[in-house]
């Protein structure tokens, strides 16, 4: 790649930016986000807590656990950006900036944001995660994986199922969850 783009700083910058976004999202999804959903508690406790506003939580919070979750999710992007800085420092920094802007944007549904239909069509074509998609992930942590790109969702779900099947402790969790739901349904509220 470097020999192709070495003659053009603009092409090098675009290449570095795209690598940071695509490879960073892949690494963050499969090396942090998916393992947290299978084995971890930090991400589930901080990012999927229904008692909290996820706009305040993801964007404004100063809670150390929330910040740690955010930093750990960003580490793959930072590593890729450091490697891409040799190709184009400006492109690597632009990739990080666009990634951070996307973090803020994808948490705006709670503020009343609705993505315009024309932009939905463009984003769907580019497989970009919309705020409405990410809102679905907050409401149901089993769907809509991929920080920036939707094409990581299906492989992430497949990997989660595989890892849960290989984890002996986790095999009983769906059974316990089903039993608990049946108990709740069987207990009728009294007025």
Regions found by a protein language model. Give the residues of each.
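Short, strongly hydrophobic alpha-helical membrane anchors
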Residues: 1-11
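Membrane-embedded catalytic scaffold of the fatty acid hydroxylase/desaturase
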Residues: 18-172
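Primarily interfacial, aromatic-capped hydrophobic alpha-helices that serve as membrane anchors
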Residues: 164-191
């Amino acid at each position: 790649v470097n020999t192709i783009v070495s003659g053009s700083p603009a092409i090098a910058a675009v290449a570095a930016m795209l690598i940071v976004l695509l490879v960073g999202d892949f690494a963050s999804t499969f090396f942090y986000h998916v393992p947290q959903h299978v084995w971890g508690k930090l991400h589930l406790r901080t990012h999927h807590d229904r008692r909290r506003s996820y706009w305040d939580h993801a964007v404004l919070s100063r809670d150390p656990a929330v910040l740690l979750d955010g930093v750990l999710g960003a580490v793959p992007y930072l590593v890729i950006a450091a490697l891409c800085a040799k190709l184009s420092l400006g492109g690597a920094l632009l990739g990080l900036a666009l990634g951070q802007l996307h973090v803020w944007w994808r948490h705006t549904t709670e503020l009343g944001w609705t993505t315009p239909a024309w932009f939905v069509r463009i984003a769907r074509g580019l497989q970009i995660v919309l705020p409405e998609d990410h809102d679905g992930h907050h409401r149901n942590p089993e769907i809509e994986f991929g920080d920036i790109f939707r094409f990581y969702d299906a492989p992430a779900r497949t990997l989660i199922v595989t890892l849960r099947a290989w984890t002996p402790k986790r095999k009983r969790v769906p059974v316990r969850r089903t039993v608990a739901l049946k108990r709740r349904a069987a207990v009728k509220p009294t007025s």
